[in-house]
Amino acid sequence: MSQLAHNLTLSIFDPVANYRAARIICTIGPSTQSVEALKGLIQSGMSVARMNFSHGSHEYHQTTINNVRQAAAELGVNIAIALDTKGPEIRTGQFVGGDAVMERGATCYVTTDPAFADKGTKDKFYIDYQNLSKVVRPGNYIYIDDGILILQVQSHEDEQTLECTVTNSHTISDRRGVNLPGCDVDLPAVSAKDRVDLQFGVEQGVDMIFASFIRSAEQVGDVRKALGPKGRDIMIICKIENHQGVQNIDSIIEESDGIMVARGDLGVEIPAEKVVVAQKILISKCNVAGKPVICATQMLESMTYNPRPTRAEVSDVANAVFNGADCVMLSGETAKGKYPNEVVQYMARICLEAQSALNEYVFFNSIKKLQHIPMSADEAVCSSAVNSVYETKAKAMVVLSNTGRSARLVAKYRPNCPIVCVTTRLQTCRQLNITQGVESVFFDADKLGHDEGKEHRVAAGVEFAKSKGYVQTGDYCVVIHADHKVKGYANQTRILLVE
């Protein structure tokens, strides 16, 4: 049955699924930093706590990390911690008097001459990107203050100065952000501040980095190098925020552990209507590659101050799920909003409704057809296991995986049931929180041999599924595990009847 035919069978009175596949990332800020507030977010549906390093000191973020871990421990769950880097940026200098009133139609000059760094006026002001004149051409636009002020470049006055026309009136203040849409900027992937922040993240044992403004695969390596050998197990999720990142997405996906569709800056760097297309491109490519993908920015923004979302916001969240996003992310809604728990609960309900309208079997077949033949052995086993779910109408899958790789491969093929990953590594439990459909169970197997531990882990996975109401006596459960007694590739699939 096609998705269109499936849509014709839907009813608003149908019950929703008994599990939510899409994961929710919450940005932690003044509204939600306390242990009690964090417990509220977790109970409402948060899987990942995001720290935005564009704001706050290391001491502030240290408190957040400690509180997240305390809240998770008190609730007996594993919550991932993500460090979102500030990234490289371009900014204006300072203005005489603190601001400048820019009038539509006026001529102004922007310069990279440091002599104007603190002497800006409406007629001439500083921008701190030294290669500005090399990458910007007449006819290009310069966006300032999140694109609220737009300048059109007319000519190169000299090697440091551009003549521009002001296209709209706006008052700008000191140190406003600058975007150069359509221009190939050559900023480094890791700023001096980022290097210090990344080392802080390594010391604190964060689970993943949301690396800002990644434009090439080489820059993923720069982030990995900055993390150093102690940070080798930290996931790198690349934020795609301009046209270069979209153009180079295939190689970026290959080098990274996942992708974030960072629609805020992306919607300034490319036309807003193109963001819709970019979102579909990035999510689909991640789906085919089996890499987690996050949809972020302004998803339920009105709930920062209002108790209910707009209908358009509800559709936006649902559309991200329909597109195939593993995670949806909240920013100011939970960092500074008045209704942090309510917004997470709303998002969870929207994701669940959208998931219930999907025909996962269509997705499974589409993904399978797009894979190269011959498949790798592990991919073949995992895709066959998902096929077994559909053929037996199994209610859950149990995957034994220390690294989480097998669980991610299974999730790539979108079974229409929850995936329970049993692992002996706590970090794997947390890092799987950005993979759709996967719930993790930590199993301490130190006192057990491998084969004895294997059966105990399978039993632990089945018991977890029963405790969540995913399976009951008489249901089928598909299990994937390794058998180290067999030579060569030894991942095995078996089908259990739940007792």
UniProtKB/Swiss-Prot annotation:
Binding site for ATP: N52, F53, S54, H55, R91
Enzyme Commission number(s): 2.7.1.40
Gene3D superfamilies per record: Phosphoenolpyruvate-binding domains, PK beta-barrel domain-like, Pyruvate kinase, C-terminal domain
Keywords, sorted A to Z: ATP-binding, Glycolysis, Kinase, Magnesium, Metal-binding, Nucleotide-binding, Potassium, Pyruvate, Transferase
Pfam families to which the protein is assigned, alphabetical: PK, PK_C
Single Gene Ontology MF annotation: kinase activity
CDD domains according to UniProt: Pyruvate_Kinase
Amino-acid positions noted as binding substrate in the UniProt annotation, renumbered to this chain: R50, G264, D265, T297
Enzyme class: transferase
InterPro entries, alphabetized: Pyr_Knase, Pyrv/PenolPyrv_kinase-like_dom, Pyrv_kinase-like_dom_sf, Pyrv_Knase-like_insert_dom_sf, Pyrv_Knase_AS, Pyrv_Knase_brl, Pyrv_Knase_C, Pyrv_Knase_C_sf
Residues reported to bind Mg(2+): E241, D265
Sequence positions that bind K(+): N52, S54, D84, T85
Reaction catalyzed: pyruvate + ATP = phosphoenolpyruvate + ADP + H(+)
Chain positions of site Transition state stabilizer: K239
Cofactor(s) in the UniProt record: Mg(2+); K(+)
Regulation: Activated by fructose 2,6-bisphosphate, activated by the effector in a non cooperative manner.
Pathway noted in the entry: Carbohydrate degradation; glycolysis; pyruvate from D-glyceraldehyde 3-phosphate: step 5/5
Origin superkingdom: Eukaryota
Subunit-level organization: Homotetramer.
Family the entry assigns: Belongs to the pyruvate kinase family.
Protein name (database record): Pyruvate kinase
Organism: Leishmania mexicana
Lineage, opening ranks: Eukaryota, Discoba, Euglenozoa, Kinetoplastea, Metakinetoplastina
